[in-house]
């Protein structure tokens, strides 16, 4: 991505997936240079990370030992933030955690409703909420 942005600072880039790290981890904040500060995104050719907002609110995509993490993230380049971009534009990011995706009872109440646990099929969807 850095070489694309060097060649074309207005490139439309969406970087999304399970990064196995929170927005504050070194791999995201320092290596990817993903930030919530749009000014830095435009000036330094780095990525915007809208997922930090959820992390700061304690809302997550995955839960382990009662600690929520935002390891599933979306990052976008400055090209998608520019007001004049008429073809593609970043609108918003979110964590899709509707009731049917949430475990209703038991030890993992409130966690994402998993497909499998302990080798047993539970009928759920994933151990992460989609973004």
Language-model segments: which ranges?
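Metal-dependent phosphoester-hydrolase catalytic domains
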Residues: 3-14, 20-131
């Amino acid at each position: 991505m850095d070489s694309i942005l060097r060649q074309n600072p207005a490139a439309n880039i969406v970087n999304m997936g399970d990064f196995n790290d929170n927005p504050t981890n070194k791999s995201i904040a320092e290596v990817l240079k993903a930030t919530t500060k749009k000014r830095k995104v435009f000036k330094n050719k780095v990525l915007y990370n809208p997922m930090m907002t959820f992390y700061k609110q304690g809302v997550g995509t995955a839960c382990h030992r009662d600690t929520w993490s935002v390891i599933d993230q979306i990052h976008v380049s400055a090209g998608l933030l520019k007001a004049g971009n008429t073809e593609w534009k970043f609108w918003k990011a979110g964590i899709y955690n509707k009731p049917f995706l949430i475990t209703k009872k038991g030890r993992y109440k409130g966690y994402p409703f998993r497909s499998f646990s302990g080798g047993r099929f539970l009928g759920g969807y994933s151990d992460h909420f989609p973004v």
